[in-house]
Amino acid sequence: MSSLLLFNDKSRALQADIVAVQSQVVYGSVGNSIAVPAIKQNGLNVFAVPTVLLSNTPHYDTFYGGAIPDEWFSGYLRALQEHDALRQLRAVTTGYMGTASQIKILAEWLTALRKDHPDLLIMVDPVIGDIDSGIYVKPDLPEAYRQYLLPLAQGITPNIFELEILTGKNCRDLDSAIAAAKSLLSDTLKWVVITSASGNEENQEMQVVVVSADSVNVISHSRVKTDLKGTGDLFCAQLISGLLKGKALNDAVHRAGLRVLEVMRYTQQHESDELILPPLAEA
C-alpha cells in the first residue's frame, strides 16, 4: 500500500517576489494569463491567485466560467502563508476582482500580511470600467475598492473613467484629472498613475500621468489603434517589475509604456487577436 508523501519541511518552500491577484483565462492574454509570463520575463518569481476563471474574454462567440467562490479564494491566500511561501515577498498586485466579498477578504489578508512585511508594496489596479463601456463589474465593487483596498495601497493605476468613479469628480481634462488624483493621496497612498489621460489625438499620442504629493509627470506615448485586450494588465505587470528591479517610479512607468507598445506592435505583426510577448531585451 502506498502512503501519501507530505511536504512538511517549510525551509524548502518555493518563494515569490510578487503575489498577483486578478483574473485568469484558459485561452487568451488578459489578467494573470499575460501578467505572470511578463513578470517572469523580468526575472522575478510570482504566485498567481485567480479571482475569476474564464474560458476567454467575453469578446468571443462562446464564453464560460465565473468568479472563484469565496471559500476557495480565501483558501488560496491562506495556503501561501500555511506553506511559508511568502518569506521573500516584496509586492502584491491586484487587477480584476470578481466580487466585493473577494475585495474584503483580500484586504483582511493584506492587513495581516503587512504585520510581517511592513515594507510590502501593494499596487492596486481598480478595474471598474472605461469611458466607452461604462461600469462592467458588479455595482458594489467601486465602494469596496474605496473602503477596503485604497486605504492599503501605496500606488494605484486607474484609467480616467475609474478615477472619476473613485473620486466622484469629472476628470475629462488634464488639470481636473490631476486634482482628482491628488485628492486620493494619503500617508499610505503615495502615487496615482492615470493610465489613459487626455492625449493629443491629432498627433496620435496618449498620455500616462504620474501624480504624487510633490510632483506631476506627464509621459506621452504613440497611440496604437487596436482592439487587443490585456494591455492594462501587461502595463501593471511591467510597472511592478520595474519598481522591484530598482527603477524610479517615473522611469518604471515610461519603460512599462514602451514595453506595452512593443508587445502590441509585435502582436499585430503576427496577426493575432491575443497579445504575444516577444523576448525581453533586458531582464
From Swiss-Prot:
Cofactors: Mg(2+)
Residues holding Mg(2+): 136, 162
Xref: InterPro entries: PdxK, PM/HMP-P_kinase-1, PyrdxlKinase, Ribokinase-like
Gene Ontology molecular function terms on file: ATP binding; hydroxymethylpyrimidine kinase activity; magnesium ion binding; pyridoxal kinase activity; zinc ion binding
Pathway: Cofactor metabolism; pyridoxal 5'-phosphate salvage; pyridoxal 5'-phosphate from pyridoxal: step 1/1; Cofactor metabolism; pyridoxal 5'-phosphate salvage; pyridoxine 5'-phosphate from pyridoxine: step 1/1; Cofactor metabolism; pyridoxal 5'-phosphate salvage; pyridoxamine 5'-phosphate from pyridoxamine: step 1/1
Cellular component, GO annotation: cytosol
Residues annotated for substrate binding in this entry: 23, 59, 233
Keyword Nucleotide-binding: yes
Coiled coil start-end: none
Pfam families in the cross-refs: Phos_pyr_kin
Record: residues binding ATP: 125, 157, 162, 195, 221-224, 231
Enzyme Commission number(s): 2.7.1.35
Catalytic activity: pyridoxal + ATP = pyridoxal 5'-phosphate + ADP + H(+); pyridoxine + ATP = pyridoxine 5'-phosphate + ADP + H(+); pyridoxamine + ATP = pyridoxamine 5'-phosphate + ADP + H(+)
Entry keyword set: ATP-binding, Kinase, Magnesium, Metal-binding, Nucleotide-binding, Transferase, Zinc
Alphabetical GO biological process terms: pyridoxal 5'-phosphate salvage
Task performed by this protein: B6-vitamer kinase involved in the salvage pathway of pyridoxal 5'-phosphate (PLP). Catalyzes the phosphorylation of pyridoxine (PN), pyridoxal (PL), and pyridoxamine (PM), forming their respective 5'-phosphorylated esters, i.e. PNP, PLP and PMP.
UniProt subunit comment: Homodimer.
Annotated family: Belongs to the pyridoxine kinase family. PdxK subfamily.
Protein's name in the database: Pyridoxine/pyridoxal/pyridoxamine kinase
Gene: pdxK
